[in-house]
Curated annotation (Swiss-Prot):
This is GTPase Era. Residues 202-280 form the KH type-2 domain. It is found in: Cytoplasm; Cell membrane. It comes from Streptococcus pneumoniae (strain JJA). Residues 4-171 form the Era-type G domain.
């Protein structure tokens, strides 16, 4: 039997459901999610393998007009995937009209010479007539290889989209072992799970001002627990105070919620220590960006 494989980028504006889609396909969380725009900062690889195929999905940061060096990194990281994939899933929301951000992405896709499948997500939120109008609007902007409406949250039509990708794969190698689901190390996934809880529990500028660094991660032979020390980086003293909370209550809640997800991922009991440090204006300093895992080697 012929084995098929290929690389697929998931592109779109912030908050259109790219990570929700990837997690649904993979059957577990490998990309963090929140209702905050620009939740995904790094390219996240999800490796979907069956006995006949391997589809390597690359979930990218939401493409937006950057205001910081971190924003520049995120947008360039997203566009760089166009150089390394066989197919692009361009995801748009069914419940929002096409905007300037979509048009900007479409112009880049036209120049990329890569087959593009339009994925219209969040179909559970709109009337069928609105969905058809949305599809017609995008169809007039460029030639798509396929147009597939889905609900990533509810799973509607997701398996059909995977089947379409499979049908269009070429014969190829199995690039990764069958049991590997991502290329990111455990430390990265741990840091993302802590950051996800900060996103869920804070508001305004704080979610965008936070980075998480895992300082150490090792098993304690006496307790048989994985001991993790993680530092939450912020840009201002006022942000540090909010994340710590009254009597340390907020930091404790962040740690408790993150620990549960980390234990599920690792399949081990975890002892998680979290600290908060101030690093002023880190989002505009390339050395700090590199230290916190946002470096140009990604693209």
């Amino acid at each position: 039997m012929t084995f098929k494989s290929g690389f697929v980028a998931i592109l779109g504006r912030p908050n259109v459901g790219k990570s929700t889609f990837l997690n649904h396909v993979m059957g577990q969380k490998i990309a963090i999610m929140s209702d905050k725009a620009q939740t995904t900062r790094n390219k996240i690889m999800g490796i979907y393998t069956t006995d006949k195929e391997q589809i390597v999905f690359i979930d990218t940061p939401g493409i937006h007009k950057p205001k910081t060096a971190l924003g520049d990194f995120m947008v360039e990281s997203a566009y760089s995937t166009l150089r390394e994939v066989d197919t692009v899933l361009f995801m748009v929301p069914a419940d929002e009209a096409r905007g300037k951000g979509d048009d900007m992405i479409i112009e880049r896709l036209k120049a990329a010479k890569v087959p593009v499948i339009l994925v219209v997500n969040k179909i559970d939120k709109v009337h069928p007539d609105q969905l058809l109008s949305q599809i017609d609007d995008f169809r007039n902007q460029m030639d798509f290889k396929e147009i597939v409406p889905i609900s990533a949250l509810q799973g509607n039509n997701v398996s059909r989209l995977v089947d379409i990708l499979s049908e269009n794969l070429g014969e190829g190698f199995q690039y990764f072992p069958s049991d590997q689901i991502t290329d990111h190390p455990e430390r990265f996934l741990v840091s993302e799970m802590v950051r996800e809880k900060v996103l869920h529990l804070t508001r305004e500028e704080i979610p965008h001002s936070v980075a998480v660094v895992v300082d150490s991660m090792k098993r304690d032979e006496e307790t048989d627990k994985v001991h993790i020390r993680a530092t939450i980086m912020v840009e201002r003293d006022s942000q540090k105070g909010i994340i710590i909370g009254k009597g340390g209550a907020m930091l404790k809640k962040i740690g408790s919620m993150a620990r549960r997800d980390i234990e599920l991922m690792l399949g081990d009991k975890v002892f998680l220590e979290t600290w908060v440090k101030v690093k002023k204006n880190w989002r505009d300093k390339k050395l700090d960006l590199a230290d916190f895992g946002y470096n140009e080697r990604e693209y």
